[in-house]
Amino acid sequence: MSAIVARNLSKKYGGKPALDEVSFSIEPGRIVGLIGPNGAGKTTALKAILGLTAFEGELSVLGQDPRVARDKLMNEVCFIADVAILPRWIRVSQAIDFVEGVHPRFSRAKCEAFLARTKLHAKQRVREMSKGMIVQLHLALVMAIDAKVLVLDEPTLGLDIL
């Protein structure tokens, strides 16, 4: 079974197509990037996958229609928006504690292993971080959740090129 299947996925904004009968299939375990210019429909496709926007056509995420099974899918899907925000007062350790307390599939050990490869430390507050460091924290938190589908909108925005 494919993780995500779209058939003739369409969405218009003010009569202008953002997605025009797009079809694709993504198999489990695959990493897929959507590449295109601004306004090409990348974020609209991600919002459709998450059940955050109405669309025409067929879309199946883990065998479910995100329009009707959004709540159920959120147990299996993790998402970082391109404008994901953390409270400026929160410390790295507090963010980890929070996610550990609310998500049953979160692995503190995985998160700490990801963060060990960065310059972030447990007592550091978000207000002391660069944009790229905040992205690193978000990625560590989300990647440490045992999700079947990760949806990352502009996940490298603000990261340093290595």
Task: Locate each region found by the language model.
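Catalytic Walker B motif of ABC-type/P-loop ATPase nucleotide-binding domains
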Residues: 150-154, 159
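ABC-family P-loop ATPase nucleotide-binding domains
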Residues: 81-138
